[in-house]
């Protein structure tokens, strides 16, 4: 178990072909993130020494990737997007493998009618990497359980945007190294337990009534007539309605699935830890390497007037290390509810 706040990082620059260009021996600072349904980033500041300086001078964006290890375990990798060389210092910024999808387009036209969103997402990813693969795998944990009607046209739109669109209607995804993980929004596997003692800076329990909806309507494109509805008047809350347009939805069935998915995320009222990023204690009983967006942690707190004991989804992780030590922060959000209808 590698405790939060006690890790030591190392960094390597790796060529697209797999060979190590150079280790970054003199790290001044390291920051890396993991994010649900989007591209994560990393940033390192290095003091070049000896031969390392010449090798760092050969770093090239997109050709080379940054690989970060924490206590000897690889925790992050992705292509270098920006590099800056100054006197006695080199700074590198990188993004995870999902950033490639923001530079790829659909390479053939296709129509999906009633396919699970994970199958559609898998097709988008494989199609994007088919002409030129930087090295990837796809891991489907479970089908999303949401059917999607989608249509993609060759050379129209960025694949990354198409994938984010699927995440708006019932799918979750994240990157772990060179693996893209696809999962349903209600994926609830837990990686640990957190209590009040694990939050040394305190926390805030919040109930977000602005997110509540008892009836959700999803429309397709204006001219399509496609519509899906989920829910109605609730015996406890009354009637709160939301109507949204999802132009990529092409069938009534997929619109209905999208409406149900959106209502599951908005009903009942979401209760969560309101801090955008909660700092963990070094004694927290969680393995930092296993803090992956999409997975969950069980949280129990009695420190406020609103006790909370529930499973929360990891929405993001931010790890920083510099001369003052390491900080590990997590973003925790409510799980989609089981509507039972």
PLM features: residue spans?
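Beta-strand-rich assembly/attachment modules of structural machines
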Residues: 1-119
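A broad structural signal for short, well-ordered beta-strand segments within beta-sheet-rich domains
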Residues: 23-29, 80, 146-150, 198-202, ...
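Acidic, small/polar-enriched beta strand-loop surface segments
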Residues: 2-17, 188-324, 336-341
């Amino acid at each position: 178990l590698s405790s939060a706040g006690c890790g030591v990082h190392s960094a390597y620059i790796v060529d697209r072909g797999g060979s190590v260009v150079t280790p970054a021996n003199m790290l001044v600072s390291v920051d890396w993130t993991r994010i649900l349904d989007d591209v994560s980033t990393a940033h390192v500041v290095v003091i070049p020494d000896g031969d390392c300086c010449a090798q760092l001078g050969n770093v090239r964006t997109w050709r080379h990737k940054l690989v970060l290890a924490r206590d000897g375990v690889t925790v992050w990798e992705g292509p270098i997007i920006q590099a800056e060389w100054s006197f006695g210092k080199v700074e590198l910024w990188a993004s995870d493998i999902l950033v490639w999808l923001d530079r790829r387009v659909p390479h053939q036209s296709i129509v999906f009618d009633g396919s699970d969103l994970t199958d559609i997402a898998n097709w988008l990813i494989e199609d994007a990497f088919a002409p030129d693969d930087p090295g990837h795998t796809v891991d489907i944990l479970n089908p999303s359980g949401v059917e999607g009607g989608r249509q993609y046209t060759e050379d129209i739109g960025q694949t990354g945007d198409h994938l984010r669109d699927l995440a708006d209607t019932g799918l979750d995804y994240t990157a772990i190294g060179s693996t893209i993980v696809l999962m349903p929004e209600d994926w609830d596997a837990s990686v640990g337990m957190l209590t009040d003692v694990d939050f040394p800076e305190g926390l805030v329990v919040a109930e977000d009534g602005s997110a509540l909806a008892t009836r959700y309507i999803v429309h397709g494109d204006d001219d399509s007539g496609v519509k899906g509805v989920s829910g109605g008047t609730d015996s406890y809350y009354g009637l709160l309605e939301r109507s949204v347009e999802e132009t990529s939805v092409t069938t009534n069935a997929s619109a209905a699935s999208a409406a149900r998915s959106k209502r599951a995320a908005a009903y009942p009222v979401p209760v969560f830890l309101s801090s955008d990023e909660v700092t963990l204690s070094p004694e927290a009983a969680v393995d930092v390497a296993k803090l992956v967006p999409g997975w969950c942690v069980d949280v129990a707190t009695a420190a406020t007037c609103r006790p909370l004991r529930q499973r929360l989804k990891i929405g993001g992780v931010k790890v920083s290390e510099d001369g003052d030590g390491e900080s590990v922060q997590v973003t925790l959000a409510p799980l989609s509810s089981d509507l039972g209808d």
